Amino acid sequence: MTTAVTQAIIDGFFDASNGDPFATLGMHETEQGIEIRTLLPDANRMVVIERESGKEITELDCVDERGFFVGVIPNCRQFFAYQLQVFWGNEAQIIEDPYRFHPMIDDLEQWLLSEGSMLRPYEVLGAHFMECDGVSGVNFRLWAPNARRVSIVGDFNYWDGRRHPMRFHSKSGVWELFLPKASLGQLYKFELIDCHGNLRLKADPFAFSSQLRPDTASQVSALPNVVEMTEARKKANQGNQPISIYEVHLGSWRRNLENNFWLDYDQIADELIPYVKEMGFTHIEFLPLSEFPFDGSWGYQPLGLYSPTSRFGSPEAFRRLVKRAHEAGINVILDWVPGHFPSDTHGLVAFDGTALYEHEDPREGYHQDWNTLIYNYGRNEVKNFLSSNALYWLERFGVDGIRVDAVASMIYRDYSRAEGEWIPNQYGGRENLEAIEFLKHTNWKIHSEMAGAISIAEESTSFAGVTHPSENGGLGFNFKWNMGWMNDTLAYMKLDPIYRQYHHNKMTFGMVYQYSENFVLPLSHDEVVHGKYSLLGKMPGDTWQKFANLRAYYGYMWGYPGKKLLFMGNEFAQGREWNYEESLDWFLLDENIGGGWHKGVLKLVKDLNQIYQKNRPLFELDNSPEGFDWLVVDDAANSVLAFERRSSNGERIIVVSNFTPVPRHNYRIGVNVAGKYEEILNTDSMYYEGSNVGNFGCVASEQIESHGRENSISVSIPPLATVYLRLKTK
């Protein structure tokens, strides 16, 4: 039998300190019969109504004028479905009592959550609109094992933490309450009394929608339906296919011309998708779109990991954007940030008064570079929260891949730390073993549950096996950004051509380790901010030379083994650094303003993408020595490089680059196969605003030995240019 309700228990509800509401509220069996107890602050009267018949059963006694009611139904021994008729002054309202509903989380779910092995915890935790016993409402669940009390507050209860305290499940540390009549679109938060007795107001870590900053509430939103992976999308992600990625920051790609405000997801779809298709990119990569509080972080300090940012519209609108990309044959990659989170008080920091998501010791849990907190990957629930988030974006929005940010900062405990500022692992080493295991687990989950989706690592060190299968000891990524190639080649391109001969190895060294990983060649947003200048701004020389250098570099990059990534604005050589608060400088494409230079680069990138997609030698064997051969690698004095790309069926393309402003006429290059070679690309073409030096469309080999080969071709290599010569097969 249930014990009597004491005044101390009642006071606990009104000072919002009662952590076990179901022990008191709802229906309880007593010697006299079923006793019903309700808490409704400021109510005057309360009548119990049988839900099925609508019959009045009894009026409850007000035992505390603040709004606590108790009544016994004599001789009643069975629980039944009931409603409450509440009188607020002279007005009456019929409501459902959330404390008459049984727990909806079962023992297996609790065990899986605690073990961290539930594949999709977002199907259980968070806010889920549903129906229970014929009553519609929202089931709220929150993991906060050390909180003394948790209440749900929101639009539905005047944000009053006294009204809806939640049920605690000690097996899992999960708090739960089904709130009848709560509905989609309503705002909510969790009000906690933490383990120290402090009051905290927290957004839902599993919220599917969140308010736009500076507001911080979560919003009840439907869990999106699963988007099935198609064979076409799978094929486009494979390593033997052409992958050319257009990296986009949605807030600054284009803006409203009248007020400089963002376009929404649908407007972006109308403009971005046709543009990307026309330019020949195969993939779009979005900078992070999980909800984040600070615009200046570009999304790399997220708090609402399960909420597409409301800056550009609703979650459903983002799904439409992805769908539009798929309809155009374009795959979508999303930047994903599991490495750290900001310390905003409504977020994950000290969630229940303890370091729940982060490490307690700042030597493990504080990121000095970004003033953020580092996840505790060794905690089962945290690891599962993160790894399942990757699966959520892939399954529920149809995203085709994720690019994991700042992997090096995750896998090394001493990353950006001086001696004494970090804690070694259990073996005394610098590797973060828990983070490494987390990455392996996440990639396993992605590849086992969403076959065909890809993961890409931004990993800036020489950590071995980033793209090797996790079962073979690798991290399990599909691709890794080739930061070494990017840094070396950009350092070379910044040099005055006079000095390039002394740094020739910067353009060739990448082939020493080319086959150690599966690489993406990235010219990303990081290279055009914080005083680094734009790509065009990095190039030496006058205007003609700057543009010629950039065109030659792009030609070299698209010919070099590895998938391609180009940040928005670089496709038309924007002159200033990227500014996240403004649109790109599209006006430069007006020839009256840009003089045709920028449009020439735009045309080149479009042609590079088209040639890349149509010619198997340029992509099929990126990760095999069979697909590449240096023809001229040692001509540092002339800053000339030449290599051959091959496909599995014997097709061949020779890539020749001249990184000086001196044209090289009658330059002889040994070739592996005799025949005619047609010039399919020349970055010095007048079509791209070049000087139009070339080879009249074709060159034929001669039986003249050169570079250790019996046959050779004599070519004209334009100044500061790259040309592609394809072996004719007919």
From Swiss-Prot:
GO molecular function: 1,4-alpha-glucan branching enzyme activity; cation binding; hydrolase activity, hydrolyzing O-glycosyl compounds
Enzyme class label: transferase
Catalyzed reaction equations: Transfers a segment of a (1->4)-alpha-D-glucan chain to a primary hydroxy group in a similar glucan chain
GO biological process assignments: glycogen biosynthetic process
EC number, as in UniProt: 2.4.1.18
Active site: D405, E458
InterPro entries: A-amylase/branching_C, Branching_enzy, GlgB, GlgB_N, GlgB_N_E_set_prok, Glyco_hydro_13_cat_dom, Glyco_hydro_13_N, Glyco_hydro_b
Pfam families hit by this protein: Alpha-amylase, Alpha-amylase_C, CBM_48, GlgB_N
GO cellular component term, pick one: cytosol
Purpose of the protein: Catalyzes the formation of the alpha-1,6-glucosidic linkages in glycogen by scission of a 1,4-alpha-linked oligosaccharide from growing alpha-1,4-glucan chains and the subsequent attachment of the oligosaccharide to the alpha-1,6 position.
HAMAP family: GlgB
PANTHER family with a match to the protein in the record: 1,4-ALPHA-GLUCAN-BRANCHING ENZYME
The protein's assembly and partners: Monomer.
Family, similarity comment: Belongs to the glycosyl hydrolase 13 family. GlgB subfamily.
Protein's name according to its UniProt entry: 1,4-alpha-glucan branching enzyme GlgB
